[in-house]
């Protein structure tokens, strides 16, 4: 699927705000929360998400969803990461 198709899919699921985000290699986001539910679909590279003490690495085509107000952290892979974000 193209980035546009992935964004449209998230919008059909009720994610009113969708956009493409790209992080540099090895970018880290320490523990934080969002006031809304977020969905992330990896387009290229990889992203490791840690939530509730569990870490999982996502690659191209993978999706991870983070509930509103869930404490989590993220680390990008050695090639960075490009991903679609949906917020609702």
Label every PLM stretch briefly:
Residues 16-34, 68:
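Conserved short histidine dyad/triad with adjacent acidic residue
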Residues 1-11:
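Extreme N-terminal tail/first-helix region
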Residues 33-49:
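Short, conserved beta-strand element in jelly-roll/cupin
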Residues 7-9, 28-34, 51, 75-76:
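Short histidine-centered beta-strand/loop micro-motifs
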Residues 68-88:
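Ligand-binding loop in jelly-roll beta-barrel domains
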Residues 25, 35, 54, 70-71, ...:
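A generic "binding-loop/recognition-motif" signal
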Residues 52-69:
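Short acidic-glycine-tyrosine-enriched beta hairpin
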